[in-house]
Amino acid sequence: MDKSKRPFLKSKRSFRRRLPPIQSGDRIDYRNMSLISRFISEQGKILSRRVNRLTLKQQRLITIAIKQARILSLLPFLNNDKQFERTESTARTAGLRARKK
């Protein structure tokens, strides 16, 4: 049999299904901070459904719970842990300006 006429066979790899991020016993509630904090980015943004691997209903409930927690000041609207490094950038530009003069 010619090499060009051989059927292309793809090797099958084993597939391991990931566990769902929300178990059946978990209650989606604005007070459940350990659950809610898993679905928020470092910046404080709500992660998308594709990233969270949630169903549409679960994502809707998580979004509502996060918004309620933000309004009640349980969660910040923005997480500003990363401060802008203005000191380095201004120091660099100030040094360049001083050299040109």
UniProtKB/Swiss-Prot annotation:
Where found, per UniProt? Plastid, Chloroplast
Q: Which SUPFAM superfamilies match?
A: Ribosomal protein S18 (SSF46911)
Q: Name one GO biological process term.
A: translation
Any one of the GO CC terms: mitochondrial small ribosomal subunit
Q: Does the keyword ATP-binding apply?
A: no
What coarse category fits the chief subcellular location reported for this protein? plastid
| Pfam families named among the record's database cross-references | Ribosomal_S18
Assigned keywords, A-Z: Chloroplast, Plastid, Ribonucleoprotein, Ribosomal protein, RNA-binding, rRNA-binding
* Coiled-coil ranges (or none): none
UniProt-listed InterPro entries: Ribosomal_bS18, Ribosomal_bS18_CS, Ribosomal_bS18_sf
Q: Which GO terms describe its molecular function?
A: small ribosomal subunit rRNA binding; structural constituent of ribosome
Ribonucleoprotein in keyword set:
yes
Family named by the database record: Belongs to the bacterial ribosomal protein bS18 family.
Indicate the quaternary assembly. Answer: Part of the 30S ribosomal subunit.
Q: What is the protein's given name?
A: Small ribosomal subunit protein bS18c
Q: What is the lineage of its organism?
A: Eukaryota, Viridiplantae, Streptophyta, Embryophyta, Tracheophyta
